[in-house]
């Protein structure tokens, strides 16, 4: 029975169930939303499903939401701000109960203004949107320290965007400053088309080929492309050149078991994001029914502490 609130006899329930089966009835979720009821649906916005991190994150989020009785609308923005905005508008028009976003586009004002539960993963969307993330700064330090311990004299950082917001870069710079080594930071923008990315990575590396002997790449696919470039130069990994990545997804560990990387707790990030979002949804429902516990609602708007990462040693360092 679609709505089981109130008393129904077993005989009535069976008759309704038979009628539903015969008519192939499907609840109209938007109509339910217009009547103030939950649509039991969540929007998930990711910048790409091509990177294993976001593919694995999506899988876990969808799985955890299904366990709680929610459907997931997966929106792949392809790293484009206009497409992300379109998906955001679409999700709002479909009256989803909440949104989980791992967007890579800064400045979308709607995240700060929509009256809907929102949680971000590894991105600061707004001071009012809780952010679930790993300890990126610690990960940057661990990666740089590992390269130096393995004998690297001048490790470079290869990342998607540089600046104070890049905490992996911050950790890398801290370690090199302590070792009195000048940082070498190379960038290939996150939104670079896949077909162009390998060529740009090679261009960046060739500019510093004579000056560096190791690379910390802030994602594992980039690290794999660095390994290919090193081998094309006739150098040996790790004897002549060392490489470490970041993410440690199941797919990469299966495809490239030799790659040294910093592993994020992706399943834990996904579960935390789901739990935090559903807590917000429950809190808003309680508020609308007269519960004025503002302290409890504020708790669900605070970002949790960053989750720890770990070094997965391989044969590339």
Where are these regions (language model features)?
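Conserved functional loop/turn residues at catalytic and ligand-binding sites
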Residues: 1, 24, 38, 69, ...
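N-terminal helix-turn-helix DNA-binding module of bacterial transcription factors
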Residues: 1-38
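Alpha-helical structural signal in soluble globular domains
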Residues: 19, 60-64, 110, 167-179, ...
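Hinge/beta->alpha junction and helix N-cap segments in small-molecule ligand-binding domains
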Residues: 29, 47-56, 74-83, 132-142, ...
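Alpha-helical recognition/docking segments in bacterial nutrient-uptake
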Residues: 37, 41-145, 149, 204-210
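A short helix->loop->beta-strand "cap" motif at the edges of active sites that frequently abuts
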Residues: 114-118, 181, 238-241
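Flexible loop/turn connectors
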Residues: 203-317
